């Protein structure tokens, strides 16, 4: 079985030899056909610590490196896309404010 290769944005590089990569995917709703966006964060191994927040990278499936780390960074696709990181942080802040108010907008 081939290994999964995913493309995403580095949203955190605060851990040693590890980056957090946000991968977004789009798919049509099975019944209504509307295109839905879903995102997931993966921990990826970065032994040289050369990838920074905002970099667009490819990650590849690997053997388990730690409890949550199952991917390693394959290559750099694009450098410094901080606009994508800002969009993620704003969305996260909005969700946090909703949870403090009990889910009411």
Swiss-Prot record:
Q: Which UniProt keywords apply?
A: Ribonucleoprotein, Ribosomal protein, RNA-binding, rRNA-binding
List the GO terms this entry assigns under cellular component, sorted alphabetically: cytosolic small ribosomal subunit
Q: Name one GO molecular function term.
A: structural constituent of ribosome
Q: Which Pfam families match?
A: Ribosomal_S17
State the superkingdom: Bacteria
Q: Which Gene Ontology terms describe the biological processes this protein takes part in?
A: translation
Q: Which PROSITE patterns match?
A: RIBOSOMAL_S17
Q: Identify the PANTHER family for this entry.
A: 40S RIBOSOMAL PROTEIN S11 FAMILY MEMBER, SMALL RIBOSOMAL SUBUNIT PROTEIN US17M
Q: What does this protein do?
A: One of the primary rRNA binding proteins, it binds specifically to the 5'-end of 16S ribosomal RNA.
Q: Quaternary structure per UniProt?
A: Part of the 30S ribosomal subunit.
User: Would you identify the family this protein belongs to, as annotated?
Assistant: Belongs to the universal ribosomal protein uS17 family.
Q: Which NCBIfam families match?
A: PRK05610.1 (NF004123), uS17_bact (TIGR03635)
State the name under which the record lists this protein. Small ribosomal subunit protein uS17
Gene source species: Thermus aquaticus
Question: Gene name?
Answer: rpsQ
């Amino acid at each position: 079985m081939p290994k999964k290769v995913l493309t995403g944005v580095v949203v955190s590089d605060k851990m040693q030899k590890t980056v957090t990569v946000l991968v977004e995917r789009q798919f049509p709703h099975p019944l209504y056909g509307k295109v839905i966006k879903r995102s997931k964060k993966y921990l990826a191994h970065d032994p040289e610590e050369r990838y920074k927040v905002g970099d667009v990278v490819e990650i590849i499936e690997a053997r388990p490196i730690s409890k949550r780390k199952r991917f390693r960074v394959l290559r750099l696709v694009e450098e410094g896309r901080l606009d994508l990181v800002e969009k993620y942080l704003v969305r996260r802040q909005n969700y946090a404010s909703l949870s403090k108010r009990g889910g009411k907008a």
